[in-house]
Amino acid sequence: MAAPPKAWKAEYAKSGRSSCKSCRSPIGKDQLRLGKMVQATQFDGLMPMWNHASCILSKKNQIKSVDDVEGIDTLRWDDQEKIRNYVGSAPATASSAAAISDKCTIEVAKSARTSCRRCGEKIKKGTVRVSSKLEGQGWYHASCFLEMSPAATVENFSGWEILSHEDKRAVLDLVKKDAPSSGQTSSKGSKRKNNQNDIHDCKAPKIIRSISEGTAEDKGKAVVSHDSNANSSDLQEKLKEQSDTLWKLKDELKKHVSTAELRNMLEANGQDTSGPERHLLDRCADGMLFGALGTCPVCSSFLYYHGGQYHCSGYVSEWSKCTYSTTEPVRSKKKWKIPDEMDNGYLTKWFKSQKAKKPERVLPPMSPEKSLCQSTQQNRSFLSEGLDKLRVSIVGQSKDVVDGWKQKLKDAGANFNATVTKDSSCLVLCSELESENAEVKKARRLKIPILREGYLGECIRKNRVLPFDLYKVEAALESSKGGTMTVKVKGRSAVHESSGLQDTGHILEDGKSIYNTTLNMSDLTRGVNSYYILQVIEEDNGSDCYVFRKWGRVGNEKIGGTKLEEMSKIHAIQEFRRLFLEKTGNPWEAWEQKTNFQKQPGKFYPLDIDYGVRQGPKRKDIDKMKSSLPPQLLELMNMLFNIETYRAAMLEFKINMSEMPLGKLSKENIQKGFEALTEIQNLLGNTNNQELAVRESLIVAASNRFFTLIPSIHPHIIQDEDDLMVKVKMLEALQDIEIASKLVGFDSDNDESLDDKYKKLRCAITPLPHDCEDYKLVEKYLLNTHAPTHKEWSLELEEVFSLDRDGEFSKYSRYKNNLHNKMLLWHGSRLTNYVGILSQGLRIAPPEAPVTGYMFGKGLYFADLVSKSAQYCYVDRKNPVGLMLLSEVALGDMYELKKATSMDKPPRGKHSTKGLGKTVPLESEFAKWRDDVVVPCGKPVPASIKTSELMYNEYIVYNTSQVKMQYLLKVRFHHKR
């Protein structure tokens, strides 16, 4: 991952066009300026608010630390000193070491539940550990902490006085080990040279390396001693001399060498020739003084100097930038080349005076604070263990309960907030939800998830932050200001409402071409999450055309802009194609014809959006039309086709709603999302055969790909299986939303009655009388089989509908007649999935989907205890009514297992899989339905099998034809807390 952006940027003005935000006067070209970095409103990114350096440095408390200033080490030395003097501390001084020491805690570990945030290993009970308030309440091994911050004064740490004498001595031994004196060889590093003032002989101090270089033990780590003022002064003198030499060379090059000659010289030495003159000067000066840089070992792209390190400028794939960085770049040992054809007296004279052996570049040392933060960030990036980022607020019945969790969270390295704040990760309830509770109200207002108490226990047990979705008491309302985009479909597409032409125009169609596209780009390494909408709109009653553009950041209406240009049809098409090529790097025909389209690095990717084509004449006053459906069925149709239900589901999954028409992501786009998740699953499982740096870059690239294909408000690196499974469930829900959208439409002009929509399901749905035998059997089955551990809610049966989906019985009849062991079993699912289920039947996860999260492989899962399946309805207090299925399942001979086992299908001779639970329905209370179908409606009792890892039975079939949906139940959940 790229380092987070800094608060300030320092540079010499590239032109005289900028104005100072403080004094309002122009900033002259090449004048030192300081820019405060702010979120841009017209594009997805940060922009500097420029000021004269003198205007900023004349005010108090503007810049807090030199580490907050990007580009400070590339300024002329005198200008660097101005900023350092303003801040009041030079890098790596005793004062900064004292500052970091004041922010640390040291103690003996009270348990073995915490993990070191640097190495990821468990911190054993009874061993000394250190916490830095700079990084929250996470813990480190004392040795790991002192390796990252050798300048820290442990005697100033909070808790030092209460350590035992033996522990103090052990820690002080580590301090001595990690801080070698000047002129001595460190136990983990190389020997520092003394009394070498010539820049050509100075040795570059090594600092914390990128994770891409491996661990410190791979090559050794030279530690810059901060205990010696002489050493620090010597280093500063070398840095000053180096800076003066670099700037003298750049000034001479700018005076005597043209831009074309700079490019030719860089090309002759195998260096990057792109960019403006200032970048060419930087690269030439670096290469001429220290030798030509080698290429990135990960992706073979060019390296460039920035912020005390050399970074890769390339892309590890078409989806992601390369994250490689190093302080020890490979350089050519040959002399810097001057092309033979170049006739430049200055360069010829310089070449003759060039020394054969180049010195190493002296790199500025990190301040202890920056060293700690960066090392922690790098080493933690793919160690998902640890709870240091979790900030929890708790509402409990008693102070003792809250205090108990508070201590457990502290021991685990998590953070406890006494009250809900905007920085809180979640609010956890240790009691029944009280809507009038002040903290609950605040959480709702701040859109912070409200979770069950069990979430904390699971996080502590697994020692990582788990996804919130499975533990939500109620879904946080996370709609963006604009809500869902209004869609009016005309022809085969829809005009964007922001154009103002929805009522008077339509998307231009020219043969098979539909001039409308939505582009997306998510790049986690750059913090980019952008969309770009491009349309050609033709007037309904004329031939005039408009090119409409809208761009911004996904989920943030305050960032971005629009543009509407009127032009002729021919010019509008040309402009559309030009912009598409500019934004994607591909011609329009490649996407339109689905041939040879290649995602280009740093470019947008088109989303495959299916608006569908409405057929049939419009009808007015749909709501006033009489329905022929029974009242119970009419109410069910209202539930199934309520657009707000689908909108809430997409918001829960943090799908972008302001620019994504509801349900319009195509089936192909969702399949590509599954493919990206499968790639991530394979990378997460491949821990032995790949370098960590390469694996990290590939996971970032696959995450970029996923969030580009599936626009999300909060993209992030998908780096553990829990998060991966949440994304799989999200895509499964999107599949059903896509089916519902295609079947009945969600656009604002949809004019179908509920009777019409019911017919489109192609599934006969008949309400059962409450006094019939089948209804009573289903009710008994529901009331009897509530599992003892599912205490959060009870279930009330409201309606039962018999089902007969077109064609399902004919497929099932073969198995019904040939397989024994048929049972009536439960299946639960989200309300938004049922249009897809009723119209297409229960479906097995597609081949593109990862296998993560399926205990017994990809199949259809059923239960014999109602509450086991009811968990998957995902209802809440606000919407307490869900739907459940009772299906007749032909199980045949079952492959019985006591623990999760990955498989594609059961062994030969077996027709299904049964996971054996420790609690089962009482067999003596089973009933028979329609002669040969078993209804396991007995009360839950302990099973004879005690060693199983499963709490309750699970039944899995791997062929959809073994299932016949029989009943749809409308069930009300009564939440107890």
UniProtKB/Swiss-Prot annotation:
Domain spans labelled BRCT: 381-473
Annotated SAP domain residues: 254-288
Pfam families in alphabetical order: BRCT (PF00533), PADR1_N (PF21728), PARP (PF00644), PARP_reg (PF02877), WGR (PF05406), zf-PARP (PF00645), Zn_ribbon_PADR1 (PF08063)
GO cellular component: nucleolus
Binding site for Zn(2+) 2: C116, C119, H141, C144
Classification via SUPFAM superfamilies: ADP-ribosylation, BRCT domain, Domain of poly(ADP-ribose) polymerase, Glucocorticoid receptor-like (DNA-binding domain), WGR domain-like
Annotated region described as Disordered, given as residue ranges: 177-199, 218-237
Binding site for Zn(2+) 1: C20, C23, H52, C55
Enzyme Commission (EC) number: 2.4.2.30, 2.4.2.-
One GO MF term attached to the UniProt entry: NAD+-protein-glutamate ADP-ribosyltransferase activity
Catalytic activity: NAD(+) + (ADP-D-ribosyl)n-acceptor = nicotinamide + (ADP-D-ribosyl)n+1-acceptor + H(+); L-aspartyl-[protein] + NAD(+) = 4-O-(ADP-D-ribosyl)-L-aspartyl-[protein] + nicotinamide; L-glutamyl-[protein] + NAD(+) = 5-O-(ADP-D-ribosyl)-L-glutamyl-[protein] + nicotinamide
Entry's localization field: Nucleus
All residue ranges annotated as the PARP catalytic domain in the record: 752-977
Domain PADR1 zinc-binding: 227-365
Family: Belongs to the ARTD/PARP family.
Name of the molecule in the record: Poly [ADP-ribose] polymerase 1
Source organism of the structure: Oryza sativa subsp. japonica
UniProt gene name: PARP1
